């Protein structure tokens, strides 16, 4: 793909649009915008400029200029992505939305909030809770990621098993389209069948079809009663195999999370702490909400019985803060062990999850890969982290990782799965997307991209290539 470089004339025009203070061209200051949370330098690409937008009008003006001068624009939130979705692989402008960070409205009576894309997810949760309401989106990076990035990637997280992913929390979005027009998509309605559902098209499109500048999200009543159970299993397949049994028993958990024992030990080292039952096996962390203490007790008894019948050696009431700190420290603990990690985000139907985990373990042994595994087990989403060891040759390690991927993805697609559950495709998984996705699906996606972004300005080279 050919794009024009940013000339002094273009830089001056950008400065006129957003202010001199909001345009950065110094290489040292731009380095952090050359990558997301993928630490492998092979995936890093420097922008030619970083532009900080303060409102939708500035975003629109930058996109119009990009179409006029034919340079790429890569929207960026907090940079916490794991698929290189905000990496400027063709240079051009990284358009940062971090200054668009206002919580515009929290309406607990009508159960909605309106926010800008640069609002931290945990800040939205706190603002809702302060009004007695609840925002259900809960990615593990909630203390650092932005709500705009959540929408752009359709982020999942711990509570997706009960409340769904980000797309289930969004009523409407304001978007700057690829030609620079500000458009309103969706409405604060519980249902509608009024033409195409365009706001849902934008959600999960990773900045390739529009730049999100405002979001109206759904709020729920703040849960009054909840508890966390920790079931410890010696056998990984028993832990994962219990998930569907819990759901089929009529218990709808808020969260069901899996951590294998070696990952638990890694997190203990990273946090410098000792976790309940860590010496006994693999974790299944189950959070459940109830209408009363008695309701919780009844659900806890049922879960204890099901877990014990299916191989749990211990079923404990978990220390809430400590167990969730441990689960959410997974990524940081892995990073502390190795800076070069292949992070897989595979997803399959929940009833196929035990078979998928068994295949992951078989392939890791076959290709002699060091792994750390955690899972949003309640929705079939397994996070397989493959760590390069210091003594391993990079080329040899990378070849084994790629061979593992080929077998793994063939297995996943044969079992009705997909290669990403919540992290997105970005640049990192683009080749695999094109290799394993149904050609008819890809053709439809490309047709949409070409129709909405005829100059291929917005986040080019992500998800798939334009032929």
Residue spans for each PLM region:
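Alpha-helix capping/hinge segments and adjacent helical runs
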Residues: 20, 413-425, 454-458
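N-terminal flexible segment immediately upstream of the FAD-binding catalytic core
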Residues: 1-64, 81-111, 140, 263-273, ...
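C-terminal substrate-recognition/cap domain of FAD-linked oxidoreductases
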Residues: 26-35, 221, 232-235, 240-407, ...
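Activity-critical C-terminal alpha-helical subdomain
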Residues: 181, 429-467
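FAD-binding subdomain of flavoenzyme oxidoreductases
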Residues: 102-257, 458
């Amino acid at each position: 793909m050919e794009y024009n470089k940013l000339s002094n004339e273009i830089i001056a025009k950008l400065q006129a649009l957003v202010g001199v203070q909001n345009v950065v061209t110094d290489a040292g200051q731009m380095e952090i915008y050359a990558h997301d949370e993928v630490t492998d330098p092979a995936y890093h690409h420097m922008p030619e400029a970083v532009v900080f937008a303060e409102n939708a009008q500035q975003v629109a003006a930058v996109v119009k200029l990009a179409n006029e001068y034919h340079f790429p624009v890569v929207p960026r939130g907090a940079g916490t992505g794991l698929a290189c979705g905000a990496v400027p692989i063709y240079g051009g402008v990284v358009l940062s939305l971090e200054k668009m960070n206002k919580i515009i409205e929290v309406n607990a009576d009508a159960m909605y909030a309106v926010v800008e894309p640069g609002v931290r997810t945990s800040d939205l949760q706190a603002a809702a809770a302060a009004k007695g309401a609840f925002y259900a989106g809960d990615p593990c990076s909630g203390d650092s990621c932005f709500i705009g990035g959540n929408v752009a990637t359709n982020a999942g997280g711990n509570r997706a098993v009960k409340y769904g992913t980000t797309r289930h929390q969004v009523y409407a979005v304001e978007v700057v389209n690829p030609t620079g027009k500000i458009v309103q998509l969706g409405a604060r309605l519980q249902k509608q069948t009024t033409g195409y559902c365009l706001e849902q098209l934008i959600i999960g499109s990773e900045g390739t079809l529009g730049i999100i500048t405002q979001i109206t999200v759904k709020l729920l009543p703040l849960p009054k009663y909840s508890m966390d159970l920790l079931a410890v299993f010696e056998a990984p397949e028993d832990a994962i195999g219990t998930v569907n049994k819990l759901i089929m028993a009529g218990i709808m958990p808020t969260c069901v999370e899996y951590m294998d024992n070696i990952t638990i030990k890694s997190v203990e080292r990273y946090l410098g702490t000792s976790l309940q039952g860590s010496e006994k096996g693999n974790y299944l962390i189950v959070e459940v909400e109830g209408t009363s203490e008695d309701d919780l007790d009844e659900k806890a008894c049922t879960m204890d019985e099901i877990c014990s019948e299916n191989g749990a050696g211990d079923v404990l009431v978990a220390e809430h803060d400590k167990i969730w700190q441990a689960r959410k420290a997974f990524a940081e603990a892995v990073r502390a062990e190795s800076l070069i990690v292949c992070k897989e985000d595979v997803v399959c139907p929940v009833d196929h999850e035990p078979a998928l985990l068994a295949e992951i373990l078989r392939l890791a042994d076959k290709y002699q890969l060091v792994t750390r595994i955690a899972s949003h087990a309640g929705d079939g989403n397994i996070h397989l982290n493959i760590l390069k060891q210091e003594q391993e040759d990079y080329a040899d390690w990378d070849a084994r990782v790629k061979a593992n991927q080929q077998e793994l993805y063939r297995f996943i697609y044969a079992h009705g799965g997909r290669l990403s559950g919540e992290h997105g495709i970005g640049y990192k998984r683009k080749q695999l997307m094109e290799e394993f996705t149904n050609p008819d699906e890809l053709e439809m996606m490309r047709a949409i991209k070409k129709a909405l972004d005829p100059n291929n300005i917005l986040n080019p080279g992500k998800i798939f290539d334009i032929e």
